[in-house]
Amino acid sequence: MPSSVQATAGLLATLMMFCGEVAMARSLLLAEPSQLAGQWQAVLSSPQDNAQTQAMQDKPSNSCLVELKVDQTLGGQTDCLGQWLGDEPVRWFTEPDGLSLIGKQDSRTHLGLRQGDHYQMTLKSGLILRLERNKSQSAH
């Protein structure tokens, strides 16, 4: 009986390692540029804001519309986004844990992936920069 318990434990350990590797490999898959291409809303908020309070105060000073292009360049209101980041973003690329923006002066800004279709980071000022799909754009 002890040898069958050891065999079962060994089989279970092997199965757990295999499942863990598969799950990790899936989590590291990069999104294709075509999957993310389109209009995105960049929103600047304080850590205390929630979706409801943010919706009530959306105004040009805390929101700008940018376009992630398939060729991994940016369009739209990149100057607005650049004011918050300190360097106007001109290129972008996906990473396993989010999205990076590259500025005109080669600065790199990393936005971590959050639930669903939005990315975010906390700026040095403590404000939160969130990049989310433009709600008025139809889903791909």
From Swiss-Prot:
An example Gene Ontology molecular-function term: endopeptidase inhibitor activity
GO cellular component, one term: periplasmic space
Localization per record: Periplasm
Listed InterPro entries: Inh/Omp19 (IPR021140), Protease_inh_b-brl_dom (IPR016085)
Signal sequence bounds: 1-25
UniProt keyword terms in alphabetical order: Metalloenzyme inhibitor, Metalloprotease inhibitor, Periplasm, Protease inhibitor, Signal
Function field: Inhibitor of the alkaline protease.
Entry similarity comment: Belongs to the protease inhibitor I38 family.
Name recorded for this polypeptide: Alkaline proteinase inhibitor
Organism listed in the record: Pseudomonas brassicacearum (strain NFM421)
